[in-house]
Swiss-Prot record:
InterPro entries on file: Rhodanese-like_dom (IPR001763), Rhodanese-like_dom_sf (IPR036873), Thiosulfate_sulfurtransferase (IPR051126), Thiosulphate_STrfase_CS (IPR001307)
Protein name listed in UniProt: Putative thiosulfate sulfurtransferase
The organism's taxonomic lineage, starting at the top: Bacteria, Bacillati, Cyanobacteriota, Cyanophyceae, Synechococcales
Induction, per UniProt: By sulfur deprivation.
Gene Ontology CC annotations of this record: periplasmic space
Length: 320
């Protein structure tokens, strides 16, 4: 028997092993693997002076996402276009308040004068910062690279004595190419597979998290989730009345301590979930873009979708 004939069975066996390994890797669903690819986008929380210094920059587009149009009419940042955060969501044939498809999101951004290559500043006002953080998340999801959230919101900007106006800006609609980066989020099938493996953060009020407050089809939370109500990330409950502001973030050192006390550390695969995906957007942005946690995703369907499924529900306060 020749040397060549001896090698051939070994080569066949080696190739068979390689083929088996490749087949196994291809068979593992990609969504079971934590998202480790860094976003190309930059999301900042910027001071009012940052915004005021850039009002004449034509590459800066400003979105006022306040829900009440009269609030915008009464006064807004110069150049700001009002499109309420509620406009970005609606029914999907089964669930309410779901994010529109990429084409509709692109149309909304384009009508507001935003293109994919612009720097976009988002701000809101009122009881929470969540409208601004939701739209900032949607801009990132849609492929915008440079995004800023106005830290302190419209109130903080106005209180700083910076310029506001009642004039409506004249602008042209822009071309916004639809994009959709699925690496930033998980769906309900992924949630089912990742429960008990990933770290779920739920920023809803404790009464909703525990199931005490009966709002949904089923009430409670995803088993093992950590309850970190979103206002704890802001100055919403500052003991000094003059400093209370649900649009103003606490120092990053305090945010990091809040997370670490709940066992939410940078080595974890973190999924943020809430009622409708809106509350989750704040902690998603803070963890990913400010604290630089490498593996953070958002469950957009959140409890609206989960409560309508037959997946397990846990009640009571979290165990951490």
């Amino acid at each position: 028997m020749s040397v060549r004939s001896l090698r051939w069975p070994r080569q066949k066996a080696f190739l068979a092993v390689i083929s088996l390994v490749v087949a196994v890797l291809l068979a593992v669903p990609g969504w079971l693997t934590p998202a480790t690819a860094a976003s190309q986008a930059t999301v900042q929380f910027v001071a009012p002076t940052w915004a005021a210094e850039r009002l004449n920059n034509k590459q800066l587009k400003i979105l006022d996402v306040r829900t009440n149009p009269l609030a915008y009419i009464e006064g807004h940042l110069p150049g700001a276009v009002n499109i309420a955060d509620a406009a970005y969501r609606g029914p999907n044939g089964f669930l309410p308040v779901q994010i529109w498809d990429p084409e509709k999101l692109a149309s909304l951004f384009g009508r507001a004068g935003v293109s994919n290559n612009d720097t976009v500043l988002v701000y809101s006002d009122g009881n929470d910062v969540l409208g601004a953080t939701l739209v900032a998340y949607l801009l990132e999801r849609s492929g915008v690279q440079n995004i800023a959230v106005l830290d302190g919101g419209y109130k903080g900007y106005k209180d700083a004595g910076l310029p506001v106006t009642k004039e409506y800006p004249r602008y042209q609609a822009a071309r916004f190419a639809p994009k959709d980066n699925r690496a930033f989020r998980v769906d309900i099938k992924q949630v089912e597979q990742l429960t008990g493996k990933s770290t779920f953060v739920d920023p809803r009020p404790p009464a909703l998290f525990s199931g005490e407050q009966q709002v949904f089809i089923r009430n409670g939370h995803i088993p093992g989730a950590r309850n970190i109500p979103w206002p704890t990330f802001t100055e919403a409950n500052n003991a000094n009345e003059s400093l209370k502001n649900p649009h103003k973030l606490k120092p990053l050192s305090e945010l990091k301590a809040i997370l670490e006390a709940k066992g939410v550390t940078p080595d974890k695969d973190v999924i943020v979930t809430c009622s409708t995906g809106r509350e989750a957007s704040l902690q998603y942005l803070v963890l990913k873009h400010l604290l630089k946690y490498p593996k953070v995703r958002i469950y957009e369907g959140s409890w609206t979708e989960y409560s309508a499924s037959n997946l397990p529900v846990e009640t009571g306060p979290d165990r951490v």
